[in-house]
Amino acid sequence: MTYAWLALAGDAYAQSAATLRIESLAASCAGCHGTNGRAAAGSAMPRLAGMPRDRFAAQMRAFQENRRPATVMHQIAKGYDAEQIHELAAYFERQGP
């Protein structure tokens, strides 16, 4: 019985750690794009919340490859690997419009 409880606790901890990891990555976007990707009304920054994951990932790749004009996003995007971009894309898509 104890082992089953530990296994369940381990799964919950792993999910918790994964959730904290992605929320931490997403928090770095909040300064410009708003909390959870919800940019303020009238903001010049694009809203990330609800953005389709394929679009988000394509935009990040475009920044990484200097194919999209930007001021700081080239440097920011280059700080993420493909897995992190995939996780961020899924996170922001789940935030809904």
Predicted regions and their residues:
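C-terminal capping alpha-helices of c-type cytochrome domains
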Residues: R68, A77-P97
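Gly/Gly-Pro-rich "capping" loops immediately C-terminal to redox-active cysteine motifs
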Residues: T19-I22, G37-E65, H74-K78
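Detector for the c-type heme attachment site
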Residues: H33-R38, E93-R94
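The canonical Cys-X-X-Cys-His
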Residues: A27-T35, L88
